[in-house]
Amino acid sequence: MLILTVSPDQYQHQNSYLKQMHRLRAEVFGNRLKWDVAIEDGGERDQYDELSPTYILATFGGQRVVGCARLLAPSGPTMLERTFPQLLATGSLSATTAMIETSRFCVDTTLPTGRAGRQLHLATLTMFAGIIEWSMANGYDEIVTATDLRFERILKRAGWPMTRLGEPVAIGNTVAVAGHLPADRKSFERVCPPGYRSIIADDNGRPLRSAA
């Protein structure tokens, strides 16, 4: 299982992976979780996909997308502040240049690759490691997100607990919560599954191009 980063300049080249990503989001958020999301041509999209985010994808066998997340700098419009301000204790996000927002995180847990540490799916831990590694490589040390109580528990089990930015709020058919997470070496080492391949360096330790 490998991590692929797709920055705006790579959208066209990685279009087939992005189509898979949108289909995976439709399956997880629309069909499985029954969230109120917009699905068109089999894929889930929203207005934040129009803001040139970077996507983190977990791929299996070099072809199948089994995990994804969207990253946006909070200095611009973000899902947390514009769509879910009720999750923030102050109603607004005190953004810094060292902060990145992650949203639309999901994994295909039907993949028969077994469970990794703490009985979490390998795709989940691979995605966590990829998000933290990309964040550190691009100068971010804090990740903010809006999620639900179920996923908050998953983060804690992974050894990457979230600090809440407000109280949980019932939204639709779920209970949502906002929080921030550290993007540092200690967190990366806790979540990193065996066999993880760095997205920052090649096999000889040479740095690869930034995904930002």
UniProtKB/Swiss-Prot annotation:
Its EC number is 2.3.1.184. The keyword RNA-binding does not apply. Keywords: Autoinducer synthesis, Conjugation, Plasmid, Quorum sensing, S-adenosyl-L-methionine, Transferase. It comes from the Bacteria. Signal peptide: none annotated. GO terms for molecular function: N-acyl homoserine lactone synthase activity. InterPro entries: Acyl_CoA_acyltransferase, Autoind_synth_CS, Autoind_synthase. One of its GO terms (biological process) is signal transduction. This is Acyl-homoserine-lactone synthase. Required for the synthesis of OHHL (N-(3-oxohexanoyl)-L-homoserine lactone), an autoinducer molecule which binds to TraR and thus acts in the control of conjugal transfer. The gene is traI. Belongs to the autoinducer synthase family. It catalyses: a fatty acyl-[ACP] + S-adenosyl-L-methionine = an N-acyl-L-homoserine lactone + S-methyl-5'-thioadenosine + holo-[ACP] + H(+). PROSITE patterns: AUTOINDUCER_SYNTH_1 (PS00949), AUTOINDUCER_SYNTH_2 (PS51187).
